Amino acid sequence: MTDPKKISRVALKGYDLTKVSRALEECEDQPGVRVGGVQIVSGGEAEAPAHLEDNRQGAIGDNFDVFSRDSKNVQIVTEHEDSSDEEYEEARSYGDDSGHQPNRAAVPFADDEYGDFKRARERLPQLFHEGWGFGSQQANEESSEGLQQQSGECGSGGGSSNAGGKDEDDLQEKTGHEKEKSVIVPPKESGSVSGYHGSCDIPFNMEEFLASPATTQRRQLLELCQLIADRSNEELIFFPWGFNLVKRKVHRVEPQQPVAVSHRFTWEDFQLKLKAGFTLIHKKTKAPVVLNSSSYNLGSVPEGGISLSPDDTELSVLIKCLRYLGLYKFLATQIEF
């Protein structure tokens, strides 16, 4: 398989690095192939069609260049010295003739359904591929610090999606070493997060996540929790290993002046609270978020609440929160194909 370091800049653009790597691998034996919405085209950079050249996203290593054709497809032009124009044209049409339809995997956040996507788009590539604990310890610490610094800049929306690439170049120039990139892969069994809001993939590699140290897991989930707060402006942020639990007072609270009380719980405290039962209120819908050990099925709470069991794991709590907050489209990488 192609060395992921050679396609690190694809990760900075938010593309699924594993799918790109697999596509590049298959391209070695075929003139062109489409894998998960990423089309591989044999030919040199000079032969790239004009409409791709005008929308060039940036080089990814010595032999590959990425071009964005439209919001639903990305072409990667691989450089082969002996490629002819005919071979290149054949490769260009390969994906369209193969029966595979363009997939959103390459540009997973193409729809602006929530309106306030600019800030999220700028931050997601960095969060997905630098700050989730699968890279080097140095990269994790740096991204964690950067995330904390960014948490107070929610309203600015400044910066560019190219910032990650610049940071990488600066780091490489100073240290002489290429910054290690993290690979986030959707779980193989996506059915575990289906239903309620619909099928989706949470951007976790389950095996790597569960095999990583507890401190790494918690750091990853904390970063996602902060991302949720920025994205949805929710006061519903409850994670049981010591993060802040924001509990809205239900009685006599004006929507314009919400009253929130912050508590800090351990996982054991959280389980005790589950047994006792307590209620949180969704900031926007005002629907109750039911944390009740007597009910485990999300579908049993038609108002849109979350029902948890003391047997829930940290990850299952996270997934239920994501589904409840309606972030499945925001955080999903793709629907399985």
Curated annotation (Swiss-Prot):
PTM description: Phosphorylated by host kinases. Phosphorylation play an important role in facilitating trimerization and possibly P-L complex formation.
Ranges annotated as biased composition (Basic and acidic residues): 90-99, 172-182
Region called Disordered, residue ranges: 77-110, 136-194
UniProt keyword terms in alphabetical order: Chaperone, Host cytoplasm, Phosphoprotein, Viral RNA replication, Viral transcription, Virion
Primary localization: virion
UniProt entry tagged with the keyword Phosphoprotein: yes
Domain of life, source organism: Viruses
One GO BP: viral transcription
Record GO cellular component, one term: host cell cytoplasm
Compartments where found: Virion; Host cytoplasm
Subunit record text: Homotrimer. This trimer is stabilized by binding to the L protein. Binds N(0), and N in ribonucleocapsid.
Function, in words: Essential component of the RNA polymerase transcription and replication complex. Binds the viral ribonucleocapsid and positions the L polymerase on the template. May act as a chaperone for newly synthesized free N protein, so-called N(0). Plays a role in virion assembly.
Name assigned to this protein: Phosphoprotein
Organism: Tupaia virus (isolate Tupaia/Thailand/-/1986)
